[in-house]
């Protein structure tokens, strides 16, 4: 079973999620804690729940999502999983935006290209859409969703029907694409072709309803979960679900589909 505690951190009201399984193995998703007091909230949760941190998962590396990354990675000696495309964000987007608004740059690490390059000071491990991140009994499928940033990712736990969408998809909105590395058409395409179809995807190890006794308790429980829309934890704002966004999000209606020439 999945357990999720989410926090709202820093001046940009960024959502950070701590997710763990029944055995206490946990991951930090987008740790935007920007002060010692905010970081202490995460540490206190880990201690009070007796959690065992496994990794940090970044949907993208914009400064407001990684302010607490270095402190937590060092505290628990854990890797940081992100897309290699976020090197552009770290080297170009963050300095440009933080410089324009007088914001501090977050501490970071160099990204390694292979496990053999790993060291204490190089904690970035690149992941792609072919990868799965294991956090105890939880399995997070990595979904590449470029558009808000070059290396944007979402993380999908298929059995629990939970999606961490970062700044790709919000309740009633999408992430902005006017920063360096942004691409509106790529973002819309990512959501329409990779995220919304997750609502119709099968659960792992499930049989079709016709293969089960329709009157059995197992059949009714599995069917109910399968037809529950995927819950979405965005990087900002309220949580939502894919069914609601597919029907009501104004950015995802047919007239907004990318132009194909």
Question: What residue ranges belong to the model's regions?
Answer:
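Short Gly/Pro-enriched turn/cap motifs at secondary-structure boundaries
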Residues: 7-8, 122-124, 144-146
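Active-site HxH/HxHxD metal-binding segment of metal-dependent hydrolases
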Residues: 33-39, 43-134, 251, 255
